[in-house]
Every structure is written in structure tokens, then in C-alpha cells.
Amino acid sequence: MVDMKANPFYLSDDDCKWVEDTIAGMTLDEKIGQLFFNMGSSREEEYLKMTVEKYHIGGIRYNPATADEVYEQNRILQENSKIPLIIACNTENGGD
């Protein structure tokens, strides 16, 4: 068992309970989906909702866009994902 209260996690008792309850409530498809990141090939709301609902992705890497476009994309994804997503970016060119 992983000690989630120790380095590098430092989770509280409530945080540990959330993690344990969340994992216990996940289907096998949801657990597998958490291993994958989507490359954000579209910012259309219907596509974004389908991606999190069908594939249960663990995160997304956004493509170059305005701050407002990236914000809206992430808002839609987070609001429709059962589990908070990790958001990644391409920062070697300043985050695009």
C-alpha cells in the first residue's frame, strides 16, 4: 500500500479517503482511461464532453490558442469529468 500521507503526496486523512473512495467507485474502463492524455484535437464542446464521458481520460494537453480558448476548453472538460483532469502544455516555446 502506498503511504499517501508521506512524501511526495502529503495528503490529509480526508484527502486519502477521497482517493480511496474514488478508486473503489471506478469501473475498469475508468481506471484504464486515467492512464491516457488527450491531445485536444478539437475545442468543440460536444467533442470535449464525449472525450471525457466515453474515454475517461486522465488529462489533456492543450494546443496553441488564446487564453480564453484554453480556459473555456479546460472549464468544459473539468465540469464534465468525474475525476479532476491533469492539464499539460507545451512550454518549451513559452506555453503557446
Stretch-by-stretch model annotation:
Residues 1-96:
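N-terminal beta-rich core of secreted/periplasmic extracellular enzymes
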